[in-house]
Amino acid sequence: SVGLAQLQPGDATQLVVGYTAAQGDHYLAVYSYTDGVLSTILEQQYQQYLVEDITGGGNQDLILMSTLEDGGVQIELLTVDKEGSFQQVAVMGLSANRFAGCASVAAGVGADGRHYLVLDGWTGISGNNLASVLLRFDEDTQQMVPADQISTEKLYTASLRNVPSLVSQDLDGDGIVEIPTQPDEAGLLNM
């Protein structure tokens, strides 16, 4: 994927490129074009990424998700400083007991006006089920924290689903991410 981003103050625009290497690993490269010179400002392995103003600072931020060696998920929030270098603002891990990887990530605004991330993670014994986590950036602690509208446990249970294509997304374009749920008997035929 290729996209343009406004990751730092001013008129400079960055080029964000996600690509797959020959061995199947995913990499993200961010380039800056200044005074006729294209330069790499970040190159990093990832599983999912998102460019969004999650900190509420007015510029877009870079959110990278990767799978840890123990199977958990790491969420990394990066911002660009005035010199054009990436700063790691926050890192958060999701337990391998719950998640085996990241299936998708979406960002939206809640009814309270805050910016939120919805992460859909692979879970279950087979690793083929999905469940969701709702996170927000806490300005006081400068960390990604679970949202307080619903407990992490309740959201995990309510969003547990066995249809891999049912990912969280803004379905109606209102800026709010819808999180799919699956009723207990969904997809079962009782005779």
Would you name each region that the model predicts?
Residues S1-M191:
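Beta-propeller-forming repeat regions
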